[in-house]
Regions:
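Active-site and substrate-binding clefts of carbohydrate-active enzymes
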Residues: 2-230, 238-240
Length: 240
C-alpha cells in the first residue's frame, strides 16, 4: 500500500463489542493475546507503516478532493433494508450477475436498499425514531447551564443507541427488551426535560406522517391518539 501511492492512508475501525462484549471474545482478544499480537505486528512494520490517530491524520494530510458519502452498511445489511419483495429480486439479480465476466465492475452499482428504509420497513423502528426526535427537541430547548440539561442529554444519548433501530443476523429491532430499553431512557429524558404543567394536552405531528396526533400527558402516563384512525391509542407510556 505504501509503495503504490505516496502518503497512502488506511483507516481501521471495528465494533467495540467484538473486543470483549460478544461471547468468547474476551478470552480470544485479551487472554489468548490477539490484541497484543495485532498491535505488535503493526509496530513491527514501523519502517513503512506509521500508526496515527484520526485527529493526527486530519492535521497532517490535506483532502484530495470532495466526496458525498451515502448512507451505507455492509452488503447483507443493505439487502435486509429492502422491502421483502425487493430482497428476492435483489438476490435474483445478484445470482445472475455472478456468472458474468464483468461482474466485478458492476458490483459497486448494485448496493441493495437505502439503510434508512429500516424505519419504513418496520413501524416499531419509526415510532422509536419519531419519539426520539420529539424528546431531542425538548432537550435542545433547555438552558444548557441548567442542572437538568446534562442528565437529560445523557438519557437521550442512551436512547439513541442504534442497535434497537435496525437488525442484523442476531439482536436488534426484533428483540423487545432492546426496544423497551430505548423507551425507558426516552421517558426518563422526557420527564427531566418536560417544562409543561403536570397535566397537559397537545396536538402535533408526533410520528412525522404529516397528520396531527393528540398527546395527553400527566405525571404518570403519556397517551398518543390518532384522530384520523377513529381515536386509535397507538402509544401508552408509563413514566418511571
Amino acid at each position: 500500500m505504501g509503495q503504490r501511492r505516496e502518503n497512502a492512508l488506511a483507516v481501521y475501525a471495528d465494533d467495540g463489542e467484538k473486543f470483549g462484549g460478544w461471547p468468547k471474545t474476551f478470552k480470544h482478544v485479551y487472554e489468548d493475546g490477539w490484541l497484543e499480537n495485532f498491535f505488535s505486528t503493526l509496530q513491527a512494520q514501523g519502517d513503512w507503516l506509521k500508526l496515527i490517530t484520526f485527529s493526527e491524520a486530519v492535521e497532517r494530510f490535506s483532502p484530495r478532493g470532495k466526496i458525498y458519502l451515502p448512507d451505507a452498511s455492509y452488503r447483507e445489511m443493505m439487502e435486509w433494508a429492502l422491502p421483502v419483495k425487493g430482497i428476492f429480486q435483489y438476490e435474483e439479480v445478484s445470482h445472475a450477475l455472478g456468472g458474468q465476466p464483468w461482474a466485478h465492475l458492476a458490483r459497486r452499482f448494485i448496493k441493495g436498499g437505502c439503510w434508512r428504509n429500516f424505519r419504513v420497513k418496520y413501524p416499531e423502528a419509526y415510532q422509536m425514531y419519531a419519539r426520539m426526535l420529539e424528546v431531542s427537541k425538548k432537550i435542545a430547548s433547555l438552558d444548557r447551564n441548567s442542572e437538568i440539561f446534562l442528565p437529560a442529554e445523557k438519557e437521550l444519548h442512551k436512547a439513541q443507541c442504534n442497535d434497537a433501530y435496525w437488525h442484523g443476523i442476531f439482536g436488534g429491532l426484533y428483540l423487545p427488551h432492546l426496544r423497551t430499553a430505548i423507551f425507558r431512557h426516552l421517558l426518563t429524558a422526557e420527564t427531566l426535560a418536560d417544562s409543561h404543567p403536570k397535566t397537559y394536552l397537545e396536538t402535533l405531528d408526533y410520528d412525522l406522517d404529516t397528520k396531527k396526533e393528540v398527546k395527553i400527558s400527566n405525571p404518570m402516563i403519556n397517551a398518543y391518539f390518532k384522530p384520523e384512525r377513529g381515536g386509535h391509542l397507538y402509544e401508552l407510556d408509563y413514566k418511571p
